Amino acid sequence: MFFTPGRGSRSPTNAVITPRFELNSSGSISPPLVVSGLGVRADGPTQAPSLPLTTGANNPNPNPKARDNPSESAATPTPPRPVVLVEMGAPTYRLAAAVTGPSGAEAGFLVARQPPPPRVQEEEGEYGRFVDSDLYDLPSAPLRRLAQGEQARPGVAVADAEAEGPLDLSRLDVPAALDQILSQLGLTNAMCGEWRLLKHIEEPEFGPDAGVNTVLVITSLESKPEALQDSCKWMSTEGARELLSDVKPGDTRIGPYVHVGFVKSDLSSDCTAGSTLVSQEYPPGITLVPMKSSTLRPFRTTNLVVIQATSGTCGSKRPDYFACGDVLLIDPGCCSQVHTELADLVNSLPKKLLVLVTHHHNDHVEGLSVVQRCNPDAVLLTHENTMKRIGKGNWSTGYTAVTGGESICIGDQELQVVFAPGHTDGHMGLLHVNTNALIVGDHCVGHGSAILDNRAGGNMKDYFQTTYKFLEMSPHVLIPMHGRINLWPKHMLCGYLKNRKAREASILQSIENGAQTLFDIVSKTYCDVDRKLWIPASFNVRLHVDHLNSQHKLPKDFSLEMFSGSCDEFMSSLQQ
């Protein structure tokens, strides 16, 4: 679930849940040889929606352009680690509404088509064919916190609005938010019965901001309206369940509010029940548990992904399945401070356990030893290039090598391993076939773009090819290991391509204008970027120069030997 298990009632009419945000220290954790995902605070109108608060395009969320400029969301995973501080602050709120037929949910509920992120003119060319399918979800609107002494205007009342506790609806402008929601549906409040508080959904600490908590309310119409807005339609619980759990590329998609409001309790259990961890399940069968890790600011956590059967356990192994289990863990990379919590989680899981590591960076493997200690029979799956870089202290026994294309069975869940080089030469992704959700490791991050590890086979040509491969797979959801999931995957991936191509063009221009050394290129290409970010930016610059050379685009008077020699001098030049 999105809220903290064991911290408040789960009953439909009592949703007083204690918000928990464990703030990490403001210092940057910097293992000197670890590269991981980073996003820098993004401010701008073109930001791709993410879960759980933002399924529409007009909400604050990660920037799909993923520019290297901090003002446009530059992502930088890598050593050494510059400090980019983003204050957590207090969570904001959003109101989502479940509007059912006159006889309740049995008569169906209303969903609204979510507006996609705005497309710019250049997307109609090369990227015009990559369009995300329609996404329907419960209607929602921002829920403003009232100022001190301010009273909400008279109007719509919600049962339990005066409830004592951390969630006090009397301090939130519920009437204004409900007005926005009803206008999306083409309804008026006079057509609705009593509004009741259904759930308070607490967003886990994905970062870099404090997140958005959601208040879910429910009402029944007095009678079904004769006409609805064109963007709205009736949905049954059974229909939503089918669209969520038996997905084909290009199908109509169902968003997270429908899942948590009407479907989730019927499909699966919470793997973090009874613990202090806050998790999020969406799509069905995929649970994200952000856990404190040694990743680079502004992120503080790495998403541990837990995939469990939604019904039954693993049966006999089919010939076409490479591996079978009752549960799959992906990237247990939490730091030692939360190894006790990781151990508790692993001990609560079925013993037929598979573990997949997308790549070798410390913030993705630091918890492997805990998993092995708790379950010595667990099977580790990873690429051979990754295993060569994982220390014996993390995993002391054998492993099963994967190269891409392997099928994995987790009870009633099917997954396909995807070879996804670029970030490193052994980087892997994973497609959750049931929901068409793509787990992308550090190829993408929930906020910003990715830096490639040039010391571990990172390669710009591979990165471009993997991005196009992901686009052709037509995923419905992107799940990164840092930050929130992205509900507009094609839009996000196209943004990554545009960003990298634009950056490569600017690097080539600086070389054509006389830049010869790494410092020359970085200082010209990133002149409007904080110098603290030049170090991580330099890793991608090296790989862009290699990519330009492989395409025979570098000027004849550009000396690769001089450029390579200047890479060792970059740090001293930066400090001058």
Regions found by a protein language model. Give the residues of each.
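Conserved Nudix-box catalytic region and its N-terminal flanking loop in Nudix hydrolases
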Residues: 2-6, 22, 37-39, 103-188, ...
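Acidic, metal-coordinating catalytic segment for phosphate/diphosphate chemistry
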Residues: 39, 65, 72, 76-96
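Metallo-beta-lactamase
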Residues: 136-139, 322-329, 334-336, 414-509
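A short coil-to-beta-strand element that immediately follows conserved catalytic motifs
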Residues: 188-200
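Active-site-adjacent beta-strand/loop module that shapes the phosphate/pyrophosphate-binding cleft
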Residues: 198-239, 252, 257-260
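Conserved beta-strand hairpin/beta-sheet module of binuclear metal-dependent hydrolase folds
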Residues: 271-348, 429-441
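Active-site HxH/HxHxD metal-binding segment of metal-dependent hydrolases
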Residues: 300, 334-411
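C-terminal regulatory/interaction regions
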Residues: 509-576
